């Protein structure tokens, strides 16, 4: 659903189908706790690894797991990334677009390509299991959604770092970072918040080879860990 382009009429019809699906779940007495389980959350982490998905997934899935009473650690994301390679060379980690991904078959194809790497008996919002949902799914473009034996990158889209600056862990997206920047040493330019960082960038205070660090923008300080896309665009 999320991959359907905004201009496609399919998005409107999918909205109606979603309403019908919700009513059918109510009729069958299938509840969120029947769908959101540890196994289904691990499936979501594996899909995010395969698509090179957003670092936001870490924040959201940890919150969902907490509300569902599922024990989940940030370091499990890093473990999954070592097991599930990056299958979709999509911008910014490749040349393909979200439209290409949708036309290749989208998330359902990712689940199909992951094969026995996912829990296939999990209940879903269709009222069927993952395995039942995938029976007729076909990969329409293996260049966009790669098979497991021919990934875009050998590691997943998310990496969890740990060190003296982040003893409880930090999240990065190596699939979107140029290879030459994976091993880097340089001075840090520290800002206490996003507003200060934007002012500093616009005032040309950042020199080539410096690392920009924006503090106090996590789940509590932000609040909500907002994306630093303005600073990145500048």
Q: Locations of the language-model features?
A:
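Catalytic or ion-coupling anion/metal-binding cores of large enzyme and transporter domains
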Residues: 1-234
